Amino acid sequence: FACNFANHMYALSARILEKHHIPFEVMLSLIDETAKKVHELPPAKAQTGPAIRYDENVINRHLDLLADVPDMQELYEKISKSIYKQK
């Protein structure tokens, strides 16, 4: 569950970045930092980002950027809600 789905999220992110002519490599330090945190904290405590804070402005901007890919937009909404509910 954790690794298989995480890798799929990387693949989806790569598609989005490629569409905007941004190399996936810009994500590597963030991916590394996120993975490192679970060595030091329980995963729920290591969670950061707009979903855990329920930052509607950022979430809505992200959803707007995904407007042309409704399947990713729906996935983003569902995962964001799941992250927020874990608080």
Positions of PLM-derived features:
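NAD(P)-dependent Rossmann-like dehydrogenase/reductase catalytic/cofactor-binding core
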Residues: 25-87
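Active-site-proximal catalytic alpha-helix in oxidoreductases
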Residues: 1-18, 29-39, 43
